[in-house]
């Protein structure tokens, strides 16, 4: 399954993009919004939505402070989305997870490394630390500086269920194809490229079929 990544200037624009596309899930990048007025219009599709308000330091598109992000998490949780995404290292991660549990909303606990890929021992320790918080899904994304980095990340699938793991960057594209087969779902942009090395949904699915049938 593929989650379409939605970037937009406001909730209304995001809604129109969702209405005119055909994905089973959508990651709504709240950090791309210039305005949050009328956020509730997205409730129509809430069961298909992942809400992600990242800080700039976590790969966010626009700057968001933690107070604003917490407010956004509270607002979108009232819509009962499929998931909210929060970065493992974020100062508000624990609070977000507690709020999500109260509201019955799934959590994707994420880790991103925009510079490289740690050795496998460190990745496995990271995975175990993240599992202790008991999120519904763990997402580990690193940057491939060599083809072997893909193998280190993909080995994590042997140690966890409900895991999304792949590498960013041109050298990481093959791991995205494997994640389309091994993970509960993976990501593809509705338009452009939201993260380095992203593949369009059609290309991702074509390559997945070529490799796995």
Swiss-Prot record:
PANTHER family to which the protein is assigned, alphabetical: 3-DEHYDROQUINATE DEHYDRATASE (PTHR43699:SF1)
Pathway as given in its UniProt record: Metabolic intermediate biosynthesis; chorismate biosynthesis; chorismate from D-erythrose 4-phosphate and phosphoenolpyruvate: step 3/7
Top EC category: lyase
Binding site for 3-dehydroquinate: 27-29, 54, 176, 198
InterPro entries per record: Aldolase_TIM (IPR013785), DHquinase_I (IPR001381), Type-I_3-dehydroquinase (IPR050146)
Protein's job: Involved in the third step of the chorismate pathway, which leads to the biosynthesis of aromatic amino acids. Catalyzes the cis-dehydration of 3-dehydroquinate (DHQ) and introduces the first double bond of the aromatic ring to yield 3-dehydroshikimate.
Name under which the protein is recorded: 3-dehydroquinate dehydratase
Listed EC numbers: 4.2.1.10
CDD domains membership: DHQase_I
A Pfam family matched in the record: DHquinase_I
GO molecular function terms noted in the UniProt entry: 3-dehydroquinate dehydratase activity
Keyword annotations of the record: Amino-acid biosynthesis, Aromatic amino acid biosynthesis, Lyase, Schiff base
Name of the coding gene: aroD
Family: Belongs to the type-I 3-dehydroquinase family.
């Amino acid at each position: 399954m593929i989650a379409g990544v939605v970037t937009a200037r406001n909730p209304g624009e995001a809604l129109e993009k969702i209405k005119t596309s055909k994905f089973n899930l959508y990651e709504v990048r709240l950090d791309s919004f210039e305005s949050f007025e009328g956020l509730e219009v997205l409730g129509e599709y809430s069961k298909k939505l992942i809400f992600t308000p990242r800080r700039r330091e976590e790969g966010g598109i626009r700057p968001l402070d933690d107070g604003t992000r917490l407010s956004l998490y509270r607002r979108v949780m009232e819509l009962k989305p499929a998931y909210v995404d929060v970065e493992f290292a974020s100062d508000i991660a624990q609070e977000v997870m507690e709020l999500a549990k109260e509201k019955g909303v799934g959590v994707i606990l994420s880790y991103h490394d925009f510079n490289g890929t740690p050795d496998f021992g460190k990745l496995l320790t990271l995975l175990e630390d993240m599992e202790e918080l008991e999120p519904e899904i763990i997402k580990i994304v690193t940057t491939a500086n060599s083809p072997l980095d893909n193998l280190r990340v993909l080995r994590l699938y042997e140690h966890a269920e409900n895991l999304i793991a792949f590498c960013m960057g041109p050298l990481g594209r093959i791991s995205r194809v494997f994640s389309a087969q091994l993970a509960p779902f993976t990501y593809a942009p509705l338009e452009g490229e939201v993260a380095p090395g992203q593949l369009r949904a059609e290309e991702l699915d074509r390559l997945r079929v070529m490799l796995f049938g």
